[in-house]
């Protein structure tokens, strides 16, 4: 049986058991009905839920040990973050997953936590698939023999249905993705997140903290409008105790396939990602040039790096993947052999 939004007892029941029953929507700056500040924060004053939240049981989340045990067979957990939307974060996630999975000895999972804007299934050409429940838990959708995906998209009755949820429901589904999905033994679990620093990010960090996260890869474009939000993302990671594996500058230029001349489409008005990484004291993983065929490959669910291995973007991506593998303690030559990388 496949869980869906038409079957709330299957899809959402377990995730919402511990949450107190509220009588009104949470205010804008609600600390969360399950947080230590529930019913005590400034935003709680005058809220109809204040007494309910204040009297709700507090303490360690009993699901955390279950999540830790469930994920104990996953060697590396990598978050992909961006401050600004539209910088190619989900595209980079799909490329990173495909690159890791290009080694037949590696098994890779992708968890799409962009609840309101899931795009990973489209990029992986599994948009019409559904997930199924077995005795072991929810089964992810397998793109290939060694690449699996889990996304809210698989639970939508119709592809274009909007997910209009507040924080607690999003948090509950993310918890269920971590607690109930039978990932099995993975070498890499890559977590794609929505832009910014929202409920989804806080939930992923709190649920994964005990099981160990290798770190986060931040994605930006060269212009200051994007870098401005990346600085906030860096601050979030530091406050949340998330190791920053490095910064990737996406769409850094366009290399003409005829003359190989590089043009700056998004000019780095303040120095771009490289200077930001140096100023903020984080690793710079590299610059990936713009290639219109990346978007086309994502639309058709194709593996861009396999189809266009000679593209400057593919070459740059391979270098980034090798650097990330080194950051998490793996031998780059085993992850992406030198014969396949430039």
Swiss-Prot record:
It is found in: Cytoplasm. Residues 16-42 are annotated as: Disordered. One of its GO terms (cellular component) is cytosol. InterPro entries: Mrp-like_CS, Mrp/NBP35_ATP-bd, NUBP1/Nbp35, P-loop_NTPase, YlxH/NBP35. One of its GO terms (biological process) is iron-sulfur cluster assembly. The keyword Cell cycle does not apply. Its main location: cytoplasm. The keyword Iron applies. Binds 4 [4Fe-4S] clusters per heterotetramer. Contains two stable clusters in the N-termini of NBP35 and two labile, bridging clusters between subunits of the NBP35-CFD1 heterotetramer. Its cofactor is [4Fe-4S] cluster. [4Fe-4S] cluster 2 binds at residues 256, 259. Pfam families: ParA. GO terms for molecular function: 4 iron, 4 sulfur cluster binding; ATP binding; ATP-dependent FeS chaperone activity; metal ion binding. ATP binds at residues 83-90. Component of the cytosolic iron-sulfur (Fe/S) protein assembly (CIA) machinery. Required for maturation of extramitochondrial Fe-S proteins. The NBP35-CFD1 heterotetramer forms a Fe-S scaffold complex, mediating the de novo assembly of an Fe-S cluster and its transfer to target apoproteins. Heterotetramer of 2 NBP35 and 2 CFD1 chains. This is Cytosolic Fe-S cluster assembly factor NBP35.
